């Protein structure tokens, strides 16, 4: 069974992330969205909420599972029986970092391959950081995130106002 692990902070999950998950769900038997705690990134949403948002966005995909984690990614992949890391590349600028990460993961988990997918071009410019910035300034984010995510962002920024 091919099990792919798609790790990230997903703060929040975007339509770009969703696009990669949908495509991965057609390529692999089982897709695990691995939502990293990432405390050093100081996420806008707590881990539990990011996991719940990702579950809501992907609930129509029966072979997709969403799990939060705070351990080393290589260890988590082994625990989950994953044999592939999925990473998205939006632009050439993403490649250098992802290449280093893939090489480090290969050292830590030699049985797990890294696979890079580019998003559909309509999502290639979307990032969680940009979505948060637009939402914080009251902009329309409906083209970039699922409605449940847009609602969560609106609610979060109301509380901060």
Swiss-Prot record:
Organism this protein belongs to: Pseudomonas putida (strain ATCC 47054 / DSM 6125 / CFBP 8728 / NCIMB 11950 / KT2440)
Q: How does it assemble?
A: Homohexamer.
Q: What is this protein called?
A: Phosphopantetheine adenylyltransferase
Amino acids binding substrate: 9, 41, 73, 87
The biological processes this protein is annotated with in GO are: coenzyme A biosynthetic process
The enzyme's E.C. designation: 2.7.7.3
The gene is coaD
A GO molecular function term, named singly, is: ATP binding
Cite the InterPro entries for this sequence: Cyt_trans-like (IPR004821), PPAT (IPR001980), Rossmann-like_a/b/a_fold (IPR014729)
Keyword Methyltransferase tagged: no
Q: What does this protein do?
A: Reversibly transfers an adenylyl group from ATP to 4'-phosphopantetheine, yielding dephospho-CoA (dPCoA) and pyrophosphate.
Q: Which Pfam families would you find in this protein's record? A: CTP_transf_like
What broad class of enzyme is this?
A: transferase
Disulfide bridge positions per record: none
Q: Which NCBIfam families match?
A: coaD_prev_kdtB, cyt_tran_rel
Where does the sequence pass through the membrane? none
Pathway the protein acts in: Cofactor biosynthesis; coenzyme A biosynthesis; CoA from (R)-pantothenate: step 4/5
Q: Which reaction does this chain catalyze?
A: (R)-4'-phosphopantetheine + ATP + H(+) = 3'-dephospho-CoA + diphosphate
Q: Where is this site: Transition state stabilizer?
A: 17
Annotated compartments: Cytoplasm
Names of the cofactor(s)? Mg(2+)
């Amino acid at each position: 069974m091919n099990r792919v692990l798609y790790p990230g902070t997903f703060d929040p999950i975007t339509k770009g992330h969703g696009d990669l998950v949908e495509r991965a769900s057609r390529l692999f038997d089982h897709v695990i969205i691995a939502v990293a705690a990432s405390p050093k990134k100081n996420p806008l949403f707590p881990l539990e909420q990011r996991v719940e948002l990702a579950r809501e966005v992907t609930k129509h995909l029966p072979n997709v599972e969403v799990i939060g984690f705070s351990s080393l990614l290589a260890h988590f992949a082994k625990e989950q029986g994953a044999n592939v890391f999925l990473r998205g590349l939006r632009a050439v600028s993403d490649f250098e970092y992802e290449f280093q990460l893939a090489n480090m993961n290969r050292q830590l988990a030699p049985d797990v391959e890294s696979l890079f997918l580019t998003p559909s071009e309509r999502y290639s410019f979307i990032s969680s950081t940009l979505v948060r910035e637009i939402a914080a300034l009251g902009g329309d984010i409906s083209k970039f995130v699922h409605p449940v995510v847009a609602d969560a962002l609106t609610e979060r920024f109301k509380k901060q106002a």
